[in-house]
Regions:
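RNA pseudouridine synthases
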Residues: 1-229
Length: 229
């Protein structure tokens, strides 16, 4: 069973422990019963086609930065969820599977409101290999973020912990200031959900347009994935 499917079923509350909602980090105890509400079927070939306007298809194709037999790199659109969830019926992954007519595998994530470079694997072997490279820090991700405030230091390391007591760590460097705004380049050293937005918020320097940790609903989130190598 693909890991992405299990994660989606958890988000949709279709995997339960003792018939109660579960989370990805839920712990099992002796005697627990796992319920999976999903009709598993073997399919020779999946029909990926969904209705997409020609203009939107062209827009998506133009955002394919690089295509290989084993993976693609896209310039992700702002405002689109990468995968399905309880409130997302069609994801960016679904759109690309439809126009490419192939199964795609998620190997890392970008938040819905974050734009920029993202990799999709085209087969399970590639997905496993690329995911392992991320875990071993053999692939590095860089982001640009814009804020209204400035850190005291022009560059440095931010270290925090999230609500799950997991370490958050990133390196930042200010590269430009303009109109009382500040542009930072960021390198992730750990991979946690909403990490950049959370760390900037915890250090009293929220990213412009961040609706997750602030009430900034007037502006687009100025956070972008700019490099993967």
């Amino acid at each position: 069973i693909p890991l992405s499917l299990l994660q989606r079923l958890i988000r949709q509350y279709k995997i339960k422990i003792n018939n109660k909602k579960s989370k990805a980090n839920s712990k099992l105890n002796s005697g627990d019963v796992i319920y999976i509400y999903y009709n598993f079927q073997f399919q020779e070939k999946q029909n990926f086609k969904i209705k997409i306007s020609k203009d939107f298809q062209n827009k998506l194709r133009k955002r394919i930065i690089f295509e290989h037999n084993d993976f693609i790199i896209i310039n992700k659109l702002n405002g689109y969820s990468v995968q399905k969830g309880s409130k997302v019926s069609i994801s960016l992954k679904d759109y690309y599977e439809s126009i490419l007519d192939t199964t795609l595998y998620i190997v890392h994530r970008l938040d819905k409101d974050t734009s920029g470079l993202m990799i999709f694997a085209k087969n399970r072997m590639a997905a496993s290999s690329i995911s392992k490279l991320f875990l071993l820090n053999k692939i590095h991700k860089y982001y640009l973020a814009t804020t209204h405030k400035s850190f005291i230091k022009n560059s440095g390391m931010l270290e925090n912990v999230n609500n799950e007591k997991k370490l958050l760590k990133l390196f930042y460097r200010k590269i430009k200031s303009f109109d009382n705004n500040y542009l930072y380049i960021i390198k992730l050293l750990t991979g946690r959900k909403h990490q950049i937005r959370l760390q900037f918020y915890l250090n009293d320097n929220p990213i412009i347009g961040d609706r997750k940790f602030t009430n900034d609903k007037k502006e687009v989130l100025l956070l972008r994935s700019i490099a993967i190598h």
